[in-house]
């Protein structure tokens, strides 16, 4: 029996891609997944290219895996670094046998066979016109929460971002394919589905009768699938928000009260330099509209500090925005220059020490805010999807609420996979504790 080890870097779409690679190679070459690279015959590193740090992690990991490659394990680099760097990876790590981009993993069976036949450098770095999803086996559930890619790529070309170059232009899967995949997951016990896209609210699909669907209509259709009791979607762009999407937050019971809507900066000047296409007030208006129909919605955002030209006043505007709106979840980063993007050549680059100082201040505010908002949940009753045994305490279970908060509580393992009501008794920095009601 051959074993496959996949290590995933970066976004949730990469996580989805990794599960589909495992499905594909299990069917084509009978690979069985393992969590131990020492036992693997094939190792795939599914990579992220958004930040330089992620790329550095890749080559550090390749160095650690080199002894395994030298004893015959096939080492492959997939994902966005594979797309962006291509043959350069072979130069920096000549023991790597395969390189492929995120739009090419449906070719893995043929690539693996070429490597098994002795080819030492197998590469697929084009962005093909063929729909890769048509060449994948039926999805296999990995638990009670499932992921379904509905949209890929990006047409926004933000000044800092490589996604349009590594994932390609915006493209939406057909409605029928999405529904079929979601139904298959539901039949395997999935109760919550996460609809994925680089710009998921730019979804523009068509059903078998030629009817056009936006994300709001797609959510309404997914909500009709038997067994699917909770729906989320990530990641959205403020430019693609619309009134129909706001309405579903107030009308579709299965839609989780959670909105990941990255703003990146609280300064209009920096948003313009980033080529984001919207202002701070336009962003706030959409947040207010969603909160009007769904008051309990959890707001999540990404923030970048130290973008070229960011002054102390610009940075303070970001802190002010955070204080004004209140964020339940946030992902914050120092600006990382990516080759080929407009921001890489901009003047007034902020030095690393200042970036670090700003990031620390930003995270302190976000952490304080998150703890306050978690403590405010005490005494509330939450519907929690039980995902497994808690890693915090023996005898406890762990799940997530509709607002994507981790909730730990005492209960029997028979509850795993079910929705249960939990009263929150303690708010912690990154989670909640509760008791079964």
UniProtKB/Swiss-Prot annotation:
GO terms for cellular component: cytosol. SUPFAM superfamilies: Radical SAM enzymes. Its main location: cytoplasm. [4Fe-4S] cluster 2 binds at residues 154, 158, 161. PROSITE patterns: MTTASE_N, MTTASE_RADICAL, RADICAL_SAM, TRAM. Residues 375-437 form the TRAM domain. SMART domains: Elp3. Residues 140-372 form the Radical SAM core domain. Its cofactor is [4Fe-4S] cluster. It catalyses: N(6)-dimethylallyladenosine(37) in tRNA + (sulfur carrier)-SH + AH2 + 2 S-adenosyl-L-methionine = 2-methylsulfanyl-N(6)-dimethylallyladenosine(37) in tRNA + (sulfur carrier)-H + 5'-deoxyadenosine + L-methionine + A + S-adenosyl-L-homocysteine + 2 H(+). Monomer. This is tRNA-2-methylthio-N(6)-dimethylallyladenosine synthase. It comes from Magnetococcus marinus (strain ATCC BAA-1437 / JCM 17883 / MC-1). The lineage of its organism: Bacteria, Pseudomonadati, Pseudomonadota, Alphaproteobacteria, Magnetococcales.
